[in-house]
Regions:
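S-adenosyl-L-methionine
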Residues: 1-95, 150-153, 216-243
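Short internal loop-to-helix segment that lines adenine-nucleotide cofactor pockets
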Residues: 21-48, 95, 109-111, 125-183, ...
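Short helix-capping segments at alpha-helix termini
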Residues: 66, 88-94, 180-185, 207-209
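Conserved S-adenosyl-L-methionine
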Residues: 99-101, 209-219
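Hydrophobic pocket-lining residues within nucleotide cofactor-binding pockets
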Residues: 101-105, 165, 192
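Conserved beta-strand signature within the Rossmann-like core of class I S-adenosyl-L-methionine
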Residues: 184-192
Length: 243
């Protein structure tokens, strides 16, 4: 019998059911990253879950540490509705804030491409377009999100970011450049791809962040499963110089 997940989830649809059943085994490094960084003595006050989907990692983080805040970012409307339903199901609306926007290197408008109609699916990507050109999706930079929704809370807590946007990760990172430079962000878990991995590495190196390779020893790390299947995606964890 599989280990029960520590939060409630609507599993009436196929993909959410799969996500619940594979929660502990699909990306154990993400669970380890959350556990390590959200211990009782943490100085982290906010997790930004970029590409939150139906909210499994947002909910897990909020369960591990009920004093932190979570920003769940999900631009696909049907998935966003399911995300909110799951948060309400767990009575976490005071802890988890949701945003039906896409994050990128600048604020504006865009269109979603490659949207799979199945609830809880992944793969959608944002394409920034001129306002009015069928631009149905709001786009924000991470710095704008933080300025509008986090800085007004007037505290010095640090930020951790999880990014899984199926190829747009570098654009998302560039949108947080001010927060990186002012020391707000202390660790990032990011899914990388063959076409952006070197640029992401260069981005972090320019900020004196380094990859924490200790996560590669987590049993069942998704990188090894992906490699065995010929999948080019790799999850990496980067930390600031002080960590």
């Amino acid at each position: 019998m599989s280990k029960q997940i520590p939060f409630l989830l609507d599993t009436t649809s196929e993909i959410p059911k799969f996500r619940a059943e594979t929660f502990w085994t699909k990306e154990p490094e993400t669970i380890h990253w959350i556990n390590r960084n959200l211990n009782e003595s943490t100085d982290i006050g906010l997790l930004i879950d970029v590409g939150a989907n139906i909210g499994i990692y947002s909910l897990y983080a909020a369960t591990v540490n009920n004093s932190i805040s979570v920003f769940s970012v999900e631009p696909v409307p049907d998935t966003f509705r399911e995300l909110n339903a799951n948060i309400e199901l767990n009575m976490k609306t005071n802890q988890i804030s949701t945003f039906m926007v896409a994050l990128s290197y600048e604020s504006g408008s865009g269109t979603l491409k490659n949207v799979d109609p199945r609830l809880g699916s992944s793969g959608a990507q944002i394409q920034i377009v001129a306002s009015g050109d069928n631009a149905s999706t709001k786009v924000l930079s991470g710095d704008r999100l933080l300025k509008d929704e986090w800085e007004k809370r007037d505290h010095g807590k640090k930020v951790m970011i999880k990014i899984d946007t199926d190829g747009n990760e570098l654009d998302v990172l560039n949108g947080f450049i001010e927060a990186f430079k002012d020391g707000s962000i202390v660790t990032v878990l990011v899914e990388t791809h063959p076409n952006n991995r070197n640029e992401i590495e260069s981005f972090f190196r320019s900020l004196d962040f380094h990859e924490d390779e200790s996560y590669l020893s987590v049993e069942g790390h998704s990188n090894y499963r992906r490699e065995a299947k010929g999948n080019g995606e790799r999850t990496k964890v980067y930390v600031c110089p002080m960590v």
